[in-house]
Swiss-Prot record:
Family label: Belongs to the universal ribosomal protein uS12 family.
Gene Ontology CC terms, in alphabetical order: small ribosomal subunit
Name listed for the protein in its UniProt record: Small ribosomal subunit protein uS12
Record Pfam families: Ribosom_S12_S23
An annotated GO BP: translation
Keywords of this entry: Methylation, Ribonucleoprotein, Ribosomal protein, RNA-binding, rRNA-binding, tRNA-binding
Function: With S4 and S5 plays an important role in translational accuracy.
Biased amino acid composition, Basic residues: 113-124
Source species taxonomy: Bacteria, Pseudomonadati, Pseudomonadota, Gammaproteobacteria, Oceanospirillales
Gene that this sequence comes from: rpsL
PROSITE patterns referenced in this protein's UniProt entry, alphabetically: RIBOSOMAL_S12 (PS00055)
UniProt keyword rRNA-binding present: yes
């Protein structure tokens, strides 16, 4: 426990909050261009081929972004919108692509949770 005199000489320092998504620079989303679209494998104990893309953002950052949903139409030079949100079993992937905006198509035949995948309501 510090004495009052010690606190007068050197006050307590505030903890600085570190951003989980530094490339967004405080913005909700950012636009970017895909430089590479590929699949990668998750950490143990999971097993899959996760779809990810490397994105060069408008602010100059280059980040890895996860492509959610079943199937996608992205390729190199596609313009995408990314949002924050990491993928726990993919190290280094801290962003998600937003489906249904810019060059990213929504997920086909999606019935539930459609807003997260840019899917239209469709005929019932």
């Amino acid at each position: 426990m510090a004495t009052i005199n010690q606190l007068v000489r050197k006050p307590r320092s505030r903890k600085v909050a570190k951003s989980d998504v530094p490339a967004l620079q405080g913005c909700p989303q950012r636009r970017g261009v895909c430089t590479r679209v590929y699949t990668t494998t998750p950490k143990k104990p999971n097993s899959a081929l996760r779809k990810v893309c490397r994105v060069r953002l408008t602010n100059g950052y280059e980040v890895t972004s996860y492509i959610g949903g079943e199937g996608h139409n992205l390729q190199e030079h596609s313009v995408v919108l990314i949002r924050g949100g990491r993928v726990k079993d993919l190290p280094g992937v801290r962003y998600h692509t937003v489906r249904g905006t810019l060059d990213t198509a929504g997920v086909n035949d999606r019935r539930q949770g459609r807003s997260k995948y840019g899917a239209k309501r469709g005929k019932s």
